[in-house]
Amino acid sequence: MEYMKRVEYLYRSVMSYRTQLDIQLLRFELSGECLIDISKRWTIKPLSRFTQRGE
């Protein structure tokens, strides 16, 4: 579950400095199960997709 920890960390970090519109974009990326990366220029880039297995 390392992916979830990283995504949650990125989400919380971004919320501290991104505008509301960008936060909505980030939420969209998270809802699409897309692991994101934030570059030094604070742009959001999809890195890879991961799947969650159902019970």
From Swiss-Prot:
This is Uncharacterized 6.8 kDa protein in trnL 3'region. It is found in: Plastid. It comes from Cuscuta reflexa. Keywords: Plastid. The keyword Plastid applies. One of its GO terms (cellular component) is plastid.
